Each structure stands twice: as structure tokens, then as C-alpha cells.
A protein has these predicted regions:
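Acidic, Ser/Pro/Thr-rich low-complexity regulatory regions
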Residues: 1-72
Length: 72
């Protein structure tokens, strides 16, 4: 498996699942699935931020990172 900036296991279960699914889609070069997972990541990172699991800066950085993979 490739090395990624964010390890899904460092985050709560739902966010972990979405990150894992995004990375799998990325490795399979399945852009449609990546876009779908990006939508999940967008809402789940918002929830994680509200719960205090991540900061707003963390969320912004994460979304930029995953968006960058999407555009790669």
C-alpha cells in the first residue's frame, strides 16, 4: 500500500472507513468513486470538527489533501 499523509486508523470509525474507501478508489483510479467518497469526507470531517476530534485547520488541510489526490 502507498504511503499517505493521513492514516485512517488515527481517526474515529466512520471517518476511518471513508478515508480507507477513498484511498482504495484512488489506487484503483476510480474517479467516480473518489468523488463519491470525497462528499462523505466533506460531511464527516465537518462532524469530526464539531465533535472536537479535529480542528477547522485540520479539516481544511485534509480536504485540500484529498482534493489534491482527486485532481492528480
Amino acid at each position: 500500500m502507498m504511503e499517505y499523509k493521513y492514516n485512517p486508523e488515527d481517526y474515529e470509525e466512520v471517518l476511518c472507513d471513508y478515508m480507507t474507501a477513498f484511498y482504495r478508489a484512488y489506487e484503483e483510479k476510480n474517479r467516480a468513486f473518489m468523488i463519491s467518497e470525497m462528499e462523505h469526507l466533506f460531511s464527516e470531517t465537518k462532524y469530526a470538527m464539531k465533535e472536537g476530534d479535529i480542528t477547522s485547520a485540520d479539516r481544511e488541510e485534509m480536504l485540500m489533501y484529498f482534493g489534491g489526490l482527486l485532481d492528480a
